[in-house]
Amino acid sequence: MTYSILTESIYNFKKKSSLDMQFLSPKNFQIENFTKIHDQTLPLKPFKTNRTAVAVVPPLPIFSPELYKRQNKLKKTQNATIFSMGTSAFKNQVKYNLETYHRSNQDTCLIHKPAVKEGDWVEVGDLLADSASSIGGELAIGHNIIVAYMPWEGYNYEDAILINERLVYEDIYTSIHIERYEVTTKETKLGFEQITREIPDISENEIKHLDKTGIAKIGSWVEEGDILVGKITPFNIKTLTPQQKLLYKIFDKQLSTTKDSSLRAPKGIKANVININILARQKIQINTKSKNTGKGSKPPRASKAQNTMVSQPSYIHIYLAEKRKMQVGDKMAGRHGNKGIVSRILPRQDMPFLPDGAAVDIVLNPLGVPSRMNVGQIYECLLGLAGRYLGEHYKIPPFDEMYGADASRSFVLSKLYEARKKTGLKWLLDPNHPGKIRLFDGRNSECFDQTVTVGIAYVLKLVHMVDDKMHARSTGPYSLVTQQPLRGRSKQGGQRLGEMEVWAIEGYGAAFVLSEMLTIKSDDMTGRQNLWKNLIENKEISLGSPESFKVLICELQALCLDIGLFRKNKETSLPYFKMPGEESKTNVNANLTGVQSSKKLEANSQTVKNSSMPNLVEIDNLLNLA
C-alpha cells in the first residue's frame, strides 16, 4: 500500500509573501492548527481556552503553527536580572531588568529566564530572555504527552480525563501560584491598631516565624491558621459581659485592653512567603503656641521646632507562593477546544501501554471528537507520534489544503511511514489500520480487542483548579433580609437550591428532604434554633415557616394588598379552608355562588377585622389547614 508524500516544496513558504499567507492574527496563529478540517465555528473556542492556561515547566511543542518572521520580530526586551551588552571597543551599555516571581492577574507566577550567556554577540531582533510560557521565543505552555482515545471503565465518560500518576510524581503539570493578602491598620475610638509581635494569649511557638515588627519573615513556611501579620486592636473592658469576666477569673487571666486581630493564613494554604510590601503615610502635626494678651491678641503662632511626624494607617501586602500538583478535579485542555476534568489518577502499572512498553499518560473519550468536529486533534497526536520517533519539529499552516487535496492527511501519513521505515517499528503504521495501534492492558498485559488511536499531543493545564472550587459549609453567615445563607465561596456561603433543583427533588418524591432544605436548612429561624435541642432530647423536629415567605407577605402588604395569616380558634375560621376533624357546613364551590355563602364570608371578614393582633399566627398552622 502506497501513501502520497508531500514534498518539501509544498511547505516552502519563502516563495510567497507573508502578507498573502497570514490569514489569522499572530496571537491566533500560535494556537490553532489544522483549521481547515475543523468546524467553522470551532477555531474561536481554543483562543478563549488558552487564555486560562497555567504556566508550567514546559518543553517546546513537537509541532507548532507557522508564524511568519515578518510579524514575529522581537524589537525590545524590557524586563529583572541585568544584561550589559558591549565590548571594550564600544563603551555604551544597555541594561534590561528581568522579572522574578512576579504575580499575574490570575495569581500565577511570571518569571523571565535569560536566553543568552555572557560573551554572546547579539544584534537587533535577537532574543534576550524567555518568559514562563515560552522557550526560544516560541509559545510553550504545556507538555507533549502520550494520549490514547479509548473508553476505560467509564472513568472518561462525558469529557472526563484519566491520567497517569507519572504526571504527578514527576511534577510535569506542577505550577506555581502567587497570592496576595492585605492587612491595614485603622483608627478606632480607643486609638490606632498596631502591628506587633506581642499578641495576647499567643504562645511563642505560634509566632516563631515572625520578625521583630510582627510580620512573617521572607522565606518562612506557613500553613493554614498561621499568623502572617500580628495585629492588636484596642479593646474596652467595660463592654465585657459578666459571664466573660467570670471566665477570666476562673482561668486566672488578666483582663487585656487589646484583642487579637491578626491576619492568618486562609484555609488550605501551604506556601512560602516570598515578598512583603509595606505602605505607610506620615503627616506633620502642627503644634502652636498661644498667649492670652487680652482683647486684640494675635492668632496662635506655629513653631517649626515642635512639629511632630504622625504615622497614618499603614497597608501591608504579603505574597505567598504555593506549588500545586495535578489532582482529581483539575481542568486540562488541548489546542483544539478539547477540554475536560481529571476524574482519576491511575498507577503507572495499570495504564495501557504501547508495544515498546511506553505507558499512556492520558486516556480521552473518543466520543468527544465526532460530535464537535475538531478532527485536528487526531492529526496533531499522529504527527506528534511521528515527530517523537524522528526527532523532528514541524511548522504547520492552518490552511494547508490550498496545496492539494487531503494535504494534511497525506503529510501525517507520510511522516508515520518515514518513522516506521527509519526505526523499524512496524506498529507505527499498520496498512490495515492506518493511524491506530494495538494497545495492551496494564492490569493483565492482554491485548485489547480493537486498535486504538494513540499519539503525542500538546496538553495544557488550565487555571480552573479544584482547590479554588471546592467548598463546604455547616453553619455560617446569613442574609439580614431573607435569613438565608449567603452565596459564594469567599463569603462562606451555602449551596444554592434553585427552582429546577426543587423540581428534580419533587420528581423523585423526596418530600422530607425537600421540606428540610426549604425550612431548617435555609431560613426557618425558629427551627434552626430548636433543631439541636430536639435532637438531644429525642423529640420530633418541628418545621416552622420560611422567613422568605414572611418577607413576601410584607412586600405584598406594602403594595396595599390586605394579606395576612390568621389563627385558628373557636371564634374565627379561615375562609376557603375546611377545618380538620369537622364537617363543612358551607358549600364552597369553584364559583363561590349562593347568598348563604356570601353572608358567611362577610361575617368571617368582619370578625377578622375586629380581632387584628390576636389573630396573627405562624405559617405552620396555615400549612396544617392547607
Curated annotation (Swiss-Prot):
Give the EC number.
Answer: 2.7.7.6
Q: List the disulfide bonds.
A: none
PROSITE patterns in the record, alphabetically?
A: RNA_POL_BETA
Specify the domain of life of the species encoding this protein.
Eukaryota
Q: Where is this region: Disordered?
A: 287-307
InterPro entries (UniProt xref): DNA-dir_RNA_pol_su2, DNA-dir_RNAP_su2_dom, DNA-dir_RNAP_su2_hyb_sf, RNA_pol_bsu_CS, RNA_pol_Rpb2_7, RNA_pol_RPB2_OB-fold
Classify the main location: plastid
The subcellular localization recorded is: Plastid, Chloroplast
Give me the segments passing through the membrane.
Answer: none
Reaction equation(s) it catalyzes: RNA(n) + a ribonucleoside 5'-triphosphate = RNA(n+1) + diphosphate
A Gene Ontology biological process in which this protein takes part is: DNA-templated transcription
Q: One Pfam family for this entry, by name? A: RNA_pol_Rpb2_6
Annotated CDD domains: RNA_pol_B_RPB2
User: Per its record, what are the GO molecular function terms?
Assistant: DNA binding; DNA-directed RNA polymerase activity; ribonucleoside binding
Q: Which GO terms describe its cellular component?
A: chloroplast; DNA-directed RNA polymerase complex; mitochondrion
Keywords, alphabetical: Chloroplast, DNA-directed RNA polymerase, Nucleotidyltransferase, Plastid, Transcription, Transferase
* Miscellaneous remark of the record: In C.reinhardtii the gene for this protein is split in two.
Q: How does it assemble?
A: In plastids the minimal PEP RNA polymerase catalytic core is composed of four subunits: alpha, beta, beta', and beta''. When a (nuclear-encoded) sigma factor is associated with the core the holoenzyme is formed, which can initiate transcription.
This molecule's function is given as:
DNA-dependent RNA polymerase catalyzes the transcription of DNA into RNA using the four ribonucleoside triphosphates as substrates.
Family statement drawn from the similarity comment of this UniProt entry? Belongs to the RNA polymerase beta chain family.
* Protein name in UniProt: DNA-directed RNA polymerase subunit beta C-terminal section
